[in-house]
Amino acid sequence: VDSLTTSEQVANSSLNSKVFSVGVDLGGTNLRVAAYSPSHGILDSTSMLTDLSSGPEGVVRSLVSAVKTLIDRFSSDYDLAGIGVGTPGPLELPAGRIHNPPNLPGWDGFELRACIERSIGSAISIASDANLAAYAEFKLGLGQQLEIDSLSMLTLGTGVGGGLVLNGRLWEGANGMGAENGHVLVYEDGAACGCGSKGCLEQYASGTAVARMARELLKESGSHGLRELYRSKPSFTAHDVYRLAREGSEDACEVFRRMGVALGIGLASIVNVLNLSLYVLGGGLVVAWDLFAPAMVNELRERSYVFRITEMDRANSIVPEALRTRILPAALGPDAGLLGACLLALPRAQPVTPFAS
């Protein structure tokens, strides 16, 4: 790619239906890249496993190759607005430097922005993946459906991320590390976290946490289902525990109940501080909503005065319906972070087509 059209140049024709952006969703498990048009949505996308064994530079090489392929495919028909990248945090901005990311071992201090820009030969836009998921959910998902201007989001995947939109603007904090909801304390002296602390929400409500808690429960109870799972697949994952829960395993269901309790404790602090009308839970683990949400809501009622007063389902509430507290699964599903990365690279005045699939 010899030269890229900048967002400022594209903004001169901001209603141009031929504008497109390329978004990157860099995760600890998967690397996804998409070309996006404001008038047509996702034009094309590609996904691959994140090869952590190749190191940060190796992952960036794969990322850049996928980005260039999509640019070459669509640049003859569309004007490129820019490239947006979402990455696990903590992410220091504006430097684009990653600090001790729990889900990207060996990446501490890696200059992600600089490495990508050197390889592509152009500036990029970069933000934490959870912030971008929140922004997409605000622009294209529940934020648009409910016509609200603020929301808080937790992403439940390999780890637990957080994002915050206030008064229509993505709020990233003083240096990009705002809304690190995965590191809210839920259990004093709890499980050690990759951030260096103990008892963080991420250690009880992420995919890695579900697998760990299932192993701990196996030692406690010797559950037949969990025992058979361990025998057939010693390195079982959260997906395996989820499948077992769907098959009726009481102990597998107990793992998700414990996850819900931890989420309720963490959300209680967030709700008490922010007092927003919408909190969104996204990421792969949301498929287990019915397994963890009842315990989550019960814990919230116990621990959050604000939630008890403003809960959407509270009978005889004096709070107007539009201002009541909703906690809902994300509307955009696993595409939220990728869509957010695409939106990040567009001129902010550019209108976008609502997500419709």
Please give the residue ranges for each predicted region:
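A short acidic/small-residue loop/turn micro-motif
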Residues: L49-D51, G106-W107, G178-E180
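ATP-dependent carbohydrate kinase catalytic cores
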Residues: E117-F138, S152-L154
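ATP-binding/phosphotransfer module of carbohydrate and carboxylate kinases, centering on a glycine-rich
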Residues: V1-G82, E92-R97, A114-S122, K139-E147, ...
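A charged helix-plus-loop insertion that forms the helical arch/lid used to bind
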Residues: G96-W107
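Glycine-rich phosphate-binding loop of actin/hexokinase-like ATP-binding domains
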Residues: L142, L146-G207
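Short beta-strand segments
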Residues: D25, G84-P88, A127, S152-G159, ...
